[in-house]
UniProtKB/Swiss-Prot annotation:
Protein name, per record: HPr kinase/phosphorylase
Region (Important for the catalytic mechanism of both phosphorylation and dephosphorylation): 206-215
One biological process term in Gene Ontology: regulation of carbohydrate metabolic process
Active site, UniProt feature: H143, K164, D182 (proton acceptor), R248
GO-annotated molecular function: ATP binding; magnesium ion binding; phosphorelay sensor kinase activity; protein serine/threonine kinase activity; protein serine/threonine/tyrosine kinase activity
Organism from which the protein derives: Leptospira borgpetersenii serovar Hardjo-bovis (strain JB197)
Length: 318
């Protein structure tokens, strides 16, 4: 698992929706941002710096801007001295408000990027929080195929050559959608949600033994692919052998941990004659039912228990 960070320059140059413009501190554009939370200094500007989150992006909205621009020069000088005594990664003024010159001077001197945006504070915080959540989410790479089947994100896993890509290709031909083949990039967006995607280089491509590299979007159309998908089920394809035990009732609820999140796991034996794509489709529909609170295995088990208790089933038939 990796915990990536991003540079301030990434926000400035790669996210036009933020509408950022650099005013000072260009030398600090390589400053790292390592957390998705932001901070509005607010009370800190009055001199209360206890628990001041200086390691976050500092957002100056209308309130902060109105306060510092209404101070007399001597007070503003003291505010700036206290504020810039902390190590800051960047400062952003929203609503297009221009910071006072003393802020520009300090940011240039200390190599702290100072930026402004015409976007309102509320909208800006919503936008940048989403960007940081996605960019800084814990992530890992996983060998397998991620495909959307009946709206369920399924990660097909298993040893190389077991038939993951071939199974996915048949599912795509049936109208389902490919997300990633071979290497799946997985990010944890919250304590219980994992998003799978693919690198830009491999996106929309599959490798099939005997055919080589295929462009799925070109062959099956734009409706056969998508860029990312929530991972809700893992199906592990395993070569069938007599000494392996596989679940035959559905009463077991095994899971596999990915980035600290438990994902439902189904082990499917692979051998000649088995129609794996239809099994995957059925597993997807069954998973949707389970999300709605319907569990066929548990219902059947309960019904059987009731029959046994009522004597409706002969335990030792002749």
């Amino acid at each position: 698992m990796s915990m990536p960070g991003i540079n301030v320059s990434n926000l400035l140059n790669e996210h036009e929706e933020l509408g950022l413009r650099l005013l000072a501190g260009e030398k600090g554009l390589t400053n790292r941002i390592n957390m998705s939370e932001i901070n509005r200094p607010g009370l800190s500007l009055t001199g209360f710096y206890e628990s001041f989150a200086h390691d976050r992006i500092q957002i100056f909205g209308k309130g902060e801007w109105a306060y510092i621009t209404s101070r007399i020069p001597e007070d503003l000088k003291n505010i700036a001295a206290d504020f810039f005594s902390f190590h800051l990664n960047c400062i952003i003024f929203t609503h297009g408000n221009m910071p006072p010159p003393i802020f520009t001077e300090n940011c240039e001197r200390l190599a702290i990027p100072l930026m402004i945006s015409d976007v309102s504070t509320h909208k800006f915080i919503t936008l940048i929080s989403g960007i940081l959540d996605r960019s800084l989410a814990p992530r890992t790479m996983r060998h397998g195929v991620l495909i959307e089947v009946f709206g369920i994100g399924i990660l097909l896993s298993g040893k190389s050559g077991v038939g993951k890509s071939e199974t996915a290709l048949e599912l795509i031909e049936r109208g389902h959608r490919l997300v990633a083949d071979d290497m799946v990039e997985i990010r944890r967006l919250s304590e219980s949600y994992l998003i799978g995607t693919c690198s830009d280089l491999l996106r929309h491509h599959m490798e099939i033994r005997g055919l080589g590299i295929l462009n799925i979007k070109d062959i099956f159309g734009i409706g056969s692919v998508r860029d990312h998908k929530l991972i809700e089920l893992i199906i592990r394809l395993e070569e069938w052998t007599e000494d392996k035990d596989f679940d035959r009732t559905g009463l077991e609820n095994p899971t596999e941990e990915l980035l600290g999140v438990q994902i439902p796991l189904i082990r499917v034996p692979v051998k000649p004659g088995r129609n794996i794509p239809i099994i995957v489709e059925t597993a997807a529909m069954n998973q949707r039912l389970r999300k709605l609170g319907k569990n066929a295995a548990q219902e059947f088990n309960q019904k059987l228990s009731n029959y046994l208790q009522q004597g409706k089933v002969e335990r030792n038939p002749p």
